Amino acid sequence: MKIKSVYAYLHKLPITKPYTIAYKTITETRIVFLEIMLENGLTGIGSANPFSAVVGETPEQTLANLQSGFLDEFIGKDIRLFNSLIHSAATHFPKQPGTLAAIDIAFHDLFCKYLEIPVLDFYGRQKDNLPTSVTIGIKEIKEMQQDADDYYKLGFRILKIKTGIDADADIERVIKLSEKFSKKMLIRVDANQGYTITDLQKFIESTSHLGLELIEQPMKVGQEHFLSVLPEKDKKLLVADESLIDAKSAWKLSNKPQPFGTYNIKLMKSGGIAGAREIAVIAKNAGIDLFWGCNDESIVSITAALHAAYSCSNTKYLDLDGSFDLAKDLVEGGFELKDGYLYPNCLPGLGFQKL
């Protein structure tokens, strides 16, 4: 079955709960969508929302790339050439992971619809369900406690707390939040590159009694060597996010001494499912766990990340809450959220429907 048309467009979607991280405040998200249609009308949808501060690509650049004329080369091609089509896109857009993610996700959705199987089962299901964390931005303590209480009432049992502006204030916030919620919720921390090695050592020592599950990207990219002074038990707590972009960086970080015990894979960094699974293989061979994260994203790419995550045996953590705070989306379905756990709906492709 041959490809008939491709169509890319951008939507600005408001966030219901604006939030602050170590280097910016977020009030809306700009998401690029890509539709690829076969001659029989079957359509695959991809989406992308890359963070320029992390990968050097904006959604506007993603849209321009998708509308540049390259995708017209796919028209008339057989969808059964699925892998070679994705490889062709990866060769053409080697430094534009947002662009590649939109293409990769759309082709995965379309090809598996054509096969009439879920993407997850195309690769081989390794997991059925896992709990996701929900994120609380940098706020006053009372606001954070209220957010945590609201999330608990909604059935979530894992919090991810944004930190990284002031280590002393972060310690106070995390301790007070833990005092109230540690018996009923796990707590993860994301410093978004905000700490020095001294800050990090102080934070770890001051919160060691709290049983924090993870500490994500504590220091700036390029400063990973400073982490070598930490004992192994502390490095096992650390998650590589901005330091981990693609298979090349995964390979570099997997060399001993390993600065991180876990890799945060985001499709907006890896360039989609194919690139994410390359990272997963490297991590598995190095004995490193997987943590699947996201930006503020459509159900389209969140579902794609979920299918990729559940196809990898070393997946241990999910932080796929990126569509929860969108005021609206362009699709529905994809997965079910129940008591904080994510369940793919197992329809063909990625299982969502356009609204």
Residue map of PLM features:
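Structured beta-strand/loop patches that form or line metal/cofactor-binding pockets in enzymes
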Residues: 1-40, 45-53, 326-331
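Flexible C-terminal active-site loop/helix
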Residues: 4-15, 31, 277, 295-355
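N-terminal small/glycine-rich loop or linker at the start of catalytic domains
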Residues: 113-137, 173, 182, 258
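Conserved, mostly hydrophobic/aromatic
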Residues: 3, 34, 41, 103, ...
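Catalytic core of soluble alpha/beta enzymes
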Residues: 161, 168-303, 328-330
